[in-house]
Curated annotation (Swiss-Prot):
Catalytic center residues: C103 (nucleophile), C195 (cysteine persulfide intermediate)
UniProt region (Interaction with tRNA), positions on chain: 145-147
EC number per UniProt: 2.8.1.13
Cystine pairs: C103-C195
Protein name per its UniProtKB record: tRNA-specific 2-thiouridylase MnmA
Subcellular location: Cytoplasm
Described purpose of this protein according to its UniProt entry: Catalyzes the 2-thiolation of uridine at the wobble position (U34) of tRNA, leading to the formation of s(2)U34.
Swiss-Prot/TrEMBL keywords: ATP-binding, Cytoplasm, Disulfide bond, Nucleotide-binding, RNA-binding, Transferase, tRNA processing, tRNA-binding
UniProt lineage: Bacteria, Bacillati, Actinomycetota, Actinomycetes, Streptosporangiales
Record-stated family: Belongs to the MnmA/TRMU family.
Species per Swiss-Prot/TrEMBL record: Thermobifida fusca (strain YX)
Amino acid sequence: MTLRVLAAMSGGVDSAVAAARAVEAGYDVTGVHLALSSNPQSYRTGARGCCTIEDSRDARRAADVIGIPFYIWDMAEEFDRDVVQDFVAEYAAGRTPNPCLRCNEKIKFQAVLERALALGFDAVCTGHHVRLENGRLRRSVDAVKDQSYVLAVLTREQLAHAIFPLGDCTKEEVRAEAARRGLTVADKPDSHDICFIADGDTSGFLERRLGSNPGPIVDETGQVVGEHRGAHAFTVGQRRGLNLSGAPHRRYVLSIEPVSNTVRVGPREALQVDRIVGERPVWSGCEPPEEWTPFLVQLRAHGEVYSCRARQYEGRVEILLDEPALGVAKGQAAVLYDGDVVMGSSTIAETSRVEQAAANHAE
């Protein structure tokens, strides 16, 4: 029986080529564009933003060229609740979220997938650069465009209904294929930054949502060294925007303490951590390891990969890095790999140095 596939079409080149490949693979494909804003822009500003009226038109034109039915689904309410409001709440709590990861988890592979299955579709197809082999996520052959990090939150059940046709090619090859197919989006710029912040001003967006809330900036000793307009404007590892005149050395954000509305700063070496605790674990590539098990871990999108040991303990994931990492932010994902295969993911809740933790325990 021919599988019915719903192709999520953003209006970009990747999703258009993915839909075309799904048709060539013999699936019965229908295209859908997700309207994620109740008040969309008419056009993009260069590579900033997405989900514009222009994007929906590009998606429809691509579907016409491919020769598949096309619909637009209004997901603005779900997107605002599960992605935008979550983004604001996480920053207000002193954490640094990844909205692309949350969108994949809550919108594309929860709300959209559930609706697709209810309508009789068998799978959802997207243009993500990732491979799916034997039910496991693998990094794309294009290391620069690899998106396994932001998809690692998907469960085995969700992956069983997912199709990713672009994991075996580079972005340049995707564009060349789009041109050969006569798709007008072949040269369309990739979208960057956060899609619902079209001007790229995250700090300004958060201030409009949360308001100005001045508070102290303190150093490692607790001495006040400056004032901020809102702790939500900062993330761990940040240096710019602190406006600390007369500092003897560069200072970086070490932590954000929302209860006291305090931003703590210090030297770069104080950013080092080698112990991470993650919450909300998802194990798509293996069973939860009860014993210490070697993995590779990635701690931010397109970030460095570290060797580590990890285990699940009392519903949380504990990770010990072989070498310290700098600027690890709470709220980001810690994605565990075996080589290039995703094993599991969790949301970073705690970070520390092992010797620091041992000293605190001894006290």
